[in-house]
């Protein structure tokens, strides 16, 4: 007896990546995400200088999400000069811990979060990263996670990969991995004096490499920290998307400021991705207006020979 078989089309997943927030998060941002119809939201951190109230608003967002903390999220705790400027009594309060408590399992720094309905796991890189070849200002990682070296950090990130429920893994970092170029305009290129150099995180790169050797499906590595507007020139902006020979999409989502105002009102930036069958087929930077419709869209990547619906 012959059976008629029909190929099942993979589910299209829509993901929003929110770049460095820097205190620019309002209720309207959540409404905008609802309007965009996303299945998952990824936050690359830097909500503000230990901005507990901003993190509280993000934590209340009722859309599946994952978050990693940035260097600004431990601004008054990670460095000696930051501690000198701390606006609160650190013997009585800990705003870093308050943020982590608000986020709970949603914070994936040195951790992971499984999304059964999407059949994927989000694995976080090193939280509170300042970027660069060394673990700069990393005492906070030693205090909170017992991590003191790049090798230990890579191993801890990799442990989350090994604990992932799903073969499809999205990596979420505050700063991106090393290996994406050493020009100042590259995704993690150093754009301050002395100009040039790879400022990516080597521990993040090593963990991704280990996951690749284990044949994990890695459609996306996304991060922020290195703002798109360059310090040394205004003639160009930073390269935002890199596609590796293996087909991994590396996305720097750090559009700063992510909320701007014009005569028509506010525009809110999101990076939108469409993923199908474990592959990113489209990446766009969009600005959403006060009517919660897309006011402008810039396509940053589209899979060759793929017809993709507008975001």
Pin down the residues of each PLM region.
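Active-site neighborhood of phospho(di)ester-bond hydrolases with catalytic His/Asp-centered motifs
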Residues: 17-20, 40-46, 65-72, 108, ...
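N-terminal active-site segment of His-dependent metallophosphoesterases
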Residues: 1-66, 73-83, 303, 311
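Binuclear metal-dependent hydrolase catalytic cores centered on His/Asp/Glu-rich metal-binding motifs
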Residues: 116-169, 194-200
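Glycine/small-residue-rich loop that forms an oxyanion/phosphate-binding "nest" at active or ligand-binding sites
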Residues: 77-111
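Active-site-proximal segments of metal-dependent phosphoesterases and phosphodiesterases across multiple
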Residues: 7-11, 167-217
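Binuclear metal-dependent phosphoesterase catalytic core
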Residues: 3, 8-11, 116, 210, ...
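Active-site-proximal beta-strand elements of phosphoester/diester hydrolases
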Residues: 12-22, 119-133, 170-174, 248-255, ...
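Active-site environment of divalent metal-dependent phosphoester hydrolases
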Residues: 22-28, 48-52, 72-79, 129-133, ...
């Amino acid at each position: 007896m012959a059976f008629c078989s029909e190929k099942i089309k993979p589910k299209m997943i829509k993901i929003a990546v929110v770049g460095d927030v820097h205190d620019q998060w309002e209720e309207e941002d959540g409404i905008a995400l609802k309007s965009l119809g996303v299945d998952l939201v990824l936050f690359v951190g830097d909500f503000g200088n230990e901005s507990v109230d901003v993190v509280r608003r993000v934590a209340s967002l009722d859309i599946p999400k994952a978050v990693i903390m940035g260097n600004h999220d431990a601004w008054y705790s990670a460095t000696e000069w930051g501690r000198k400027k701390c606006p609160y009594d650190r013997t009585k309060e800990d705003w870093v811990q308050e943020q982590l408590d608000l986020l709970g399992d949603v914070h994936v720094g040195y951790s992971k979060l499984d999304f059964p309905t999407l059949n994927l796991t989000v694995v976080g890189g090193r939280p509170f990263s300042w970027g660069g070849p060394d673990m700069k200002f990393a005492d906070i990682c030693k205090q909170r996670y017992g991590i003191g070296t790049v090798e230990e950090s890579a191993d801890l990130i990799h442990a989350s990969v090994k604990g992932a429920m799903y073969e499809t893994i999205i990596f979420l970092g505050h700063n991106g991995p090393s290996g994406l170029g050493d020009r100042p305009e590259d995704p993690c290129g150093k754009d301050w004096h002395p100009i040039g150099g790879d400022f990516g995180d080597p521990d993040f790169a090593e963990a991704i490499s280990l996951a690749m050797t284990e044949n994990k499906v890695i459609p996306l590595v996304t991060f922020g920290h290195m703002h798109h507007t360059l310090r040394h020139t205004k003639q160009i902006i930073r390269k935002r998307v890199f596609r590796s020979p293996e087909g991994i999409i590396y996305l720097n989502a750090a559009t700063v400021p992510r909320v701007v105002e014009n005569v028509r009102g506010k525009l809110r930036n999101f990076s939108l991705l469409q993923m199908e069958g474990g592959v990113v087929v489209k990446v766009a930077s969009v600005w959403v207006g006060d009517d919660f419709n897309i006011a402008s869209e810039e396509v940053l990547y589209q899979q060759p020979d793929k017809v993709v619906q507008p975001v």
